[in-house]
């Protein structure tokens, strides 16, 4: 399971002209689900995403996680993160989970974030989405479990 996380000052996702999720300061999480992923990996990745210390403390040091910084999370499904790009000029998506399995694990990941009392907004799984963000820093990390 893969999360591309970006520290943002604001982010939103729109589907068919409707804003489905919007946050101020926090994390934009682009989530990719691979074939061998399961709930245990989703739990571990959620723990890492919410615990990752990439927000500045009073001394300007990256020492706070999103909850400590008072931020929110916007989770957007992105199957392209599971692409195999090592060969050729066209990505292969053979490493990605089936749509049904990926949606179940995406929903599970979102629910785990919410269970941590995290303000968690979302896109719409498998929809054609427009994502807007202001990357703060820029600060972007690839987390994989």
UniProtKB/Swiss-Prot annotation:
GO molecular function: aminoacyl-tRNA deacylase activity; D-aminoacyl-tRNA deacylase activity; D-tyrosyl-tRNA(Tyr) deacylase activity; Gly-tRNA(Ala) deacylase activity; protein homodimerization activity; Ser(Gly)-tRNA(Ala) hydrolase activity; tRNA binding
Pfam families, A to Z: Tyr_Deacylase
Phenotype on disruption: No phenotype in rich or minimal medium, decreased growth rate in the presence of excess D-tyrosine. A double dtd-dadA deletion mutant has a more pronounced growth defect in the presence of D-Tyr (in strain K12 / EC989). In a dtd deletion mutant about 40% of tRNA(Tyr) is D-tyrosyl-tRNA(Tyr); overexpressing the gene for tRNA(Tyr) suppresses the toxicity of D-Tyr by increasing the levels of L-tyrosyl-tRNA(Tyr) available for translation. Decreased growth in the presence of D-Asp, D-Ser, D-Gln and D-Trp. Poor growth on 20 mg/ml D-Tyr, no growth on 500 mg/ml D-Tyr or 20 mg/ml D-Trp.
Effect of residue 78 to A: Wild-type deacylation of D-tyrosyl-tRNA(Tyr)
Motif Gly-cisPro motif, important for rejection of L-amino acids: positions: 137-138
EC number: 3.1.1.96
Protein function: An aminoacyl-tRNA editing enzyme that deacylates mischarged D-aminoacyl-tRNAs, has no observable editing activity on tRNAs charged with cognate L-amino acid. Edits mischarged glycyl-tRNA(Ala) more efficiently than AlaRS. Acts via tRNA-based rather than protein-based catalysis. Rejects correctly charged L-amino acid-tRNAs from its binding site rather than specifically recognizing incorrectly charged D-amino acid-tRNAs.
Quaternary data: Homodimer.
Record comment regarding domains: A Gly-cisPro motif from one monomer fits into the active site of the other monomer to allow specific chiral rejection of L-amino acids.
Family stated for the protein in its record: Belongs to the DTD family.
NCBIfam families assigned: D-aminoacyl-tRNA deacylase
Name of the protein in question: D-aminoacyl-tRNA deacylase
The organism of origin for this protein: Escherichia coli (strain K12)
């Amino acid at each position: 399971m893969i999360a591309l996380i970006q520290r943002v000052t604001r982010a939103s996702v729109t589907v068919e002209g409707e804003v489905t999720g919007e946050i101020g300061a926090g994390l934009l999480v682009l989530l990719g689900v691979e074939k061998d992923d399961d709930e245990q990996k989703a739990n571990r990745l959620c723990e890492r995403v919410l615990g990752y210390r990439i927000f500045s403390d009073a001394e300007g040091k990256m020492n706070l996680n999103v909850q400590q910084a008072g931020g929110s999370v916007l989770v957007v499904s992105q199957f392209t993160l599971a692409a195999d790009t090592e060969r050729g000029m066209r990505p292969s998506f053979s490493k990605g989970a089936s749509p049904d399995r990926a949606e179940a694990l995406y929903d599970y990941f979102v629910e785990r974030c919410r269970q941590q009392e995290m303000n968690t907004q979302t896109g719409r799984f498998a929809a054609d989405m427009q994502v807007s963000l202001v990357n703060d820093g820029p600060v972007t990390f690839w987390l994989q479990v």
